[in-house]
Amino acid sequence: ILEQAGMQPSIISGAGLTRIIKEGKIGNAKVGAGEWLVIEADESDGSIVQYHPEIGLLLNIDKDHQEIDELMSIFGIFKNNSKKFIVNQSNTLAKQLSQNIKNDFASDENSEAGYIAKDFTQNGFCISFIIHNSTFIINSIGKHNMENALAAITVACQIGVDLETCASALKTYEGIYRRNQVLGNKNGVWVIDDYAHNPVKCASAIAACQPVADKVVAWFQPQGYGPTRFLRNDFVKEIAAVLRPQDEIWMR
């Protein structure tokens, strides 16, 4: 979005952006000529508390690397270190750290957040939704990717980018490496790779694939014995809630 707006941002992210990878670069880092640096900060090692951003953005708080009370403490410090702090009002825990609800975003149409995504639809590998009467179409899948886009749009609007520019930019969005990445189709079976590793993310990845196929067979590769043991009950709860009778999940 910021590149489409002519801001030439620098980027440090986790996974590589497909468009940057196509340029022959590593994909998750790029130096731009503009004044903005976009960082995907990491709470897993606590290093996020060392950042003092102009704008801090929080999409969700879910049990992952630490217990919830530890995560709330870490993100509370991050909030205090941010000049402006924007949260997802549709996430129960994230909204508790709201600085100003009018700067926040939500996918709940009854929310009082300043930026609300409405009329979400997924047609195959494409999603669409509306924000303030502007229609957004993205070549991606899943409601969670609508929330990701909504978060980026909210921040962009805070620094002067209009919704039309945001919509135009997202029409050409090419995705991120191993984030709902379509690898191909064999004998009518779509193969999709996703790095989802905690209970909520795994459930979201499965739900995103369901409109594409009558049956989803998910293969889950845990990060290790410790994290799997730590999150076992949450995995069962979240994944069971989204599986249809015909769907399957396997662990390898």
Q: What is the meaning of each model-derived region?
A:
Residues S10-I12, V38, D104:
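Short beta-strand "acidic-cap" motif of Rossmann-like dinucleotide-binding folds
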Residues I12-S13, E40, L59-N60, N88, ...:
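Short beta-strand segments
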Residues E35-S44, V191-H197:
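Switch II (G3) loop of P-loop NTPases
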Residues E43-D45, K63, N91, A196-N198, ...:
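Short, glycine/acidic-enriched loop or turn micro-motifs at the edges of active sites
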Residues I176, A207-R252:
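Active-site beta-alpha connecting loops in nucleotide-dependent enzymes
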Residues R178, D193-S204:
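Glycine-rich phosphate/pyrophosphate-binding beta-alpha loops
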